[in-house]
Amino acid sequence: MSRIESVEVFVASPGRTFVTLRITTTDGVTGLGDATLNGRELAVASYLRDHVVPLLIGRDPARIEDTWQFLYKGAYWRRGPVTMTAIAAVDTALWDILGKTAGLPVHQLLGGRSRDGVLVYSHASGTDVPSLLDDVERHLELGYKAVRAQAAVPGVGGTYGVRKGRVYEPAASELPDEQPWDTEAYLDFAPRYLEAVRERFGFGFHLLHDVHHRLTPNEAARFGKSVEASRLFWMEDPTPAENQESFRLIRQHTTTPIAVGEVMNSIWDVQHLITEQLIDYVRTTVVHAGGITHLRRIFDLAALHQVRTGSHGATDLSPVSMAAAVHLDIAVPNFGIQEYMGHADETAEVFRTGVTFADGMLHPSDEPGLGVEYDEKAAERFPYQRRYLPVARRLDGSVHDW
C-alpha cells in the first residue's frame, strides 16, 4: 500500500510570494498544494513544517477525508486562516495525488463537468474615469464577459483598485502602505463611474464592483440602491462580515446582489449568511477554506439555499490554487463566477499549469490530477521577499477597514 514518504515546503517570490507544499508517496507520485496567506506566508510555512509535516509521514495518501479530519480535529485549536490554509495545502496535494494515481483529472473525481467552461471576471482600474474606461475596453477586447471596475477616488491619495504595473498587486511594500480614505467622496464618485462604464459599453457584459468592507450597513444599503440602474453582477464585501446580521438591513433596501466570504475560512463562518440567504454569492476560496474537501461542503450548503459560488482568485492564489478552483468550479451545480487576474511572467517560470483561458472562460487541464508542475530550480531564483497589504486611515487619522 502506498504511503506518504516525504513532505516539502517551498517559499519563493516569483512576482509575489507563494508557499507551496509538495507531498511524495512511496510509489513516487507527487502532489502539490498552495499554502499562501497574503502577508503571513512564513507563519503558514512554519505551521506546516513544525506541526503538520511530522503527522503526514507514513499516512495513506488516499484517505483524504480522514487526513482532513485528523488535521482539523486533532489539533484541538480550530479554524483561523493559518490553520485552514495549512490544511488546504495538504488536502489539495492529496487530491492531486489521487487524480494522478487514478489517471483522471480532479474534476472527474468530483463528479465530472457540470458546464463547458468556468466564467471568470478580471480587474479593470484607473486613476480617473477615462483611464478606467480604457482598461474596461482592454478587458473586453481580450474576451472577458465580466469585468470588475474600480477607480481612484478624487482627492484621496490611496490607490486601492488601481493598476501598479503589469499585474496589480496591493501587497507591494515591506511595511504596510498607509492610505487615506474618504467614505463620502467614494459614495459620491463610485456610482458615477459605474454609470459611465454602462453608458460607454452598454449592458452586454457583467459589471462587478468591490467595496472592500469599507462601509457601514446603512452606507452599504445607500450605495447598493444608488447603483441599481447599473445592474451590477454584485457588490462585493459592502460591509465587514463579522456583523452578519447587518446584511439583513442591506437586503431590505437594495436589490443589488451581494458577494461575501473572501476573508472567511470555514463553513461555520458563512453558515448564517447562507442559511438566512443574506448573500447571493459566497467567495470563500480553496486555499483559505480548508482545500477542495471543505470548500465543496461550503458550496453544497450554498446550493441548498440558492446561493452561488464566486470564489476569490486574485494573485495571492498560486497557479496550484487556481487549478484546484477551476476543477471544483466546473463540477459544482451552483457555480456563479470565478475571479481571475492572471499572474506575473515570473510566476509562469516557476509554475506550469494546464489551465487555459478562451472566450471569457477558464478551462481545467485534462491531465491526471491538478495539471500543475512546480519547478524547484526556477523558484530558487526568486528568494522570499516580505510584503504587506496596505492599511487604510480615515481623513481624521483613525484606522479604517482596507
UniProtKB/Swiss-Prot annotation:
Gene3D superfamilies: Enolase-like C-terminal domain (3.20.20.120), Enolase-like, N-terminal domain (3.30.390.10). SUPFAM superfamilies: Enolase C-terminal domain-like, Enolase N-terminal domain-like. GO terms for molecular function: magnesium ion binding; mannonate dehydratase activity. GO terms for biological process: amino acid catabolic process; carbohydrate catabolic process. InterPro entries: D-mannonate_dehydratase-like, D-mannonate_dehydratase_GalD, DgoD-like, Enolase-like_C_sf, Enolase-like_N, Enolase_C-like, Mandel_Rmase/mucon_lact_enz_CS, Mandelate_racemase_C. PROSITE patterns: MR_MLE_1 (PS00908), MR_MLE_2 (PS00909). PANTHER family: D-GALACTONATE DEHYDRATASE-RELATED, STARVATION-SENSING PROTEIN RSPA. This is Uncharacterized protein ORF2 in unstable DNA locus.
